[in-house]
Design a protein with these regions (language model features):
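Amphipathic protein-protein interaction modules
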Residues: 51-121
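Short hydrophobic short-linear motifs embedded
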Residues: 131-138
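Context-gated lysine
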Residues: 40, 44, 98, 117, ...
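N-terminal low-complexity, intrinsically disordered segments
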Residues: 1-59, 72-73
C-alpha cells in the first residue's frame, strides 16, 4: 500500500483538529494497529501514550509531526481508517459525543467506546442472516 495523507494539523479556535485526531490516533496505537517498524522506532513515546503519560494530541503533534497518514499504520489499521475515518463516521461519532460532554477525559473515554464499537463491526464477519438479508434485499 502506498503512503496516503489523511489529514494535517490545523490551528485556531474553530479549526483546531489536534484533539479530534489525537483521540483516534491514540486509540489506533493502543489497539496495536501500528506498523512494527514504527513501534520499534517510537517505543518510548508509544509506552508513554499507553501509560497515559502522553495524550493523543501530544503524540499527534510531536511524534507524527502533525501529519495523520498511513505510514505509521499496519494494513488492518490503514483499511479501518480508510473506511471509518475517511468515510466520515468518525467525525460523526466524535461530534455526537463532543456535543454532550465537556470533560476531556470523559470525552476521550466515550469517543474510544465509539471507535471500539465501529472496529468490532468492521472486523466481525457478517453473519449468515445478514448475508441472506443482503441477497434478499437485492431481489
Amino acid at each position: 500500500m502506498t503512503y496516503r495523507s489523511y489529514e494535517t494539523i490545523q490551528f485556531g479556535d474553530l479549526t483546531s483538529n489536534s484533539d479530534r485526531l489525537g483521540m483516534l490516533i491514540a486509540w489506533l496505537v493502543n489497539h496495536q494497529l501500528t506498523d512494527a517498524n514504527f513501534e520499534k522506532e517510537n517505543a518510548k513515546a508509544i509506552s508513554r501514550l499507553r501509560l497515559e503519560d502522553m495524550t493523543g494530541p501530544e503524540f499527534f503533534t510531536t511524534v507524527l509531526h502533525g501529519e495523520f497518514g498511513s505510514a505509521f499504520l499496519n494494513h488492518l489499521g490503514q483499511d479501518f481508517v480508510e473506511e471509518y475515518f475517511l468515510g466520515g463516521t468518525y467525525d460523526y461519532d466524535y461530534n455526537q459525543v463532543k456535543s454532550g460532554v465537556a470533560d476531556e477525559r470523559l470525552l476521550s473515554n466515550h469517543v474510544s467506546q465509539r471507535i471500539s464499537k465501529a472496529y468490532r463491526k468492521y472486523v466481525e464477519p457478517p453473519s449468515l442472516a445478514k448475508k441472506l438479508a443482503r441477497v434478499l434485499r437485492f431481489r
